[in-house]
């Protein structure tokens, strides 16, 4: 049995619509090269909550909370060709999307 190569692409952003849009665009590019693809797989959303005092030095009970969520998607490509990798490298992702690629 031959060993299969895998590429895992993890997309992260604070805007869920941006992550979904670019995940679909990556899938469209990979489908053109006849590689097997799994995804986009939604990973758990992480909420970040920060609590700060409203006043600079008094009123400890008066606080304000700020929160934001980071959304993640995973795309797995099985048996990528050199054409697949070249097309993925040519994609220009926006600055709001963080991409992590593992092979």
Swiss-Prot record:
User: Which GO MF terms does the UniProt record name?
Assistant: structural constituent of ribosome; tRNA binding
Record's PROSITE patterns? RIBOSOMAL_S10 (PS00361)
Biological process annotations from GO: translation
Q: Name one GO cellular component term.
A: ribosome
Q: Where are the transmembrane segments?
A: none
Q: How does it assemble?
A: Part of the 30S ribosomal subunit.
What is the name attached to this protein's record?
Small ribosomal subunit protein uS10
Q: What lineage is this protein's organism placed in?
A: Bacteria, Pseudomonadati, Chlorobiota, Chlorobiia, Chlorobiales
